[in-house]
């Protein structure tokens, strides 16, 4: 019962720096993928109320998307910048990007300093997103429909 009551409070935010697998999977057209790659577009996505992956924002450059994902955490984390709950980062063959997100999160959320855990994305999810994907998970506001 607790899980059912709280499952929508887990925030899932993702970005990808490589659109190749999105093109191969049919989620992005070849033309859009080519243009997106040329412009260094990194989509910012999240899991909605129904558990579906939703594109939220198209951000230019890796540096800016790392800042954008951290801003989402500031906006949605339980207790804002005073958040002291669990924080996980997963990545698909981009450890340095995951570490950059962790470093930024730890610098802005003082209670998390040294407590952000980084893991690899599993093969099932990784086969859909490909390399260059970073996911940020934390406890926050309930996801609405």
PLM regions: where:
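Mixed-charge interfacial surface used for oligomerization/domain docking
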Residues: 1-145
């Amino acid at each position: 019962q607790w899980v059912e009551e709280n499952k929508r409070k887990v925030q899932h935010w993702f970005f990808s720096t490589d659109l190749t697998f999105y093109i191969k999977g049919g989620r992005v057209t070849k033309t859009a993928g080519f243009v997106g790659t040329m412009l260094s577009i990194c989509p910012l996505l999240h899991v909605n109320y129904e558990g579906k992956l939703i594109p939220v924002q198209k951000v230019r450059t890796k540096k800016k998307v790392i800042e954008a994902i951290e801003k989402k955490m500031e906006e949605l984390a339980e207790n804002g910048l005073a958040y002291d709950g669990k924080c996980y980062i997963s990545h698909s063959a981009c450890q340095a990007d995951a570490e950059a997100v962790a470093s930024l999160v730890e610098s802005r959320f003082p209670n998390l300093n040294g407590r952000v855990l980084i893991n690899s994305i599993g093969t099932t999810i990784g086969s859909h997103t490909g390399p260059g994907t970073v996911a940020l998970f934390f406890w926050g506001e309930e996801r609405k429909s």
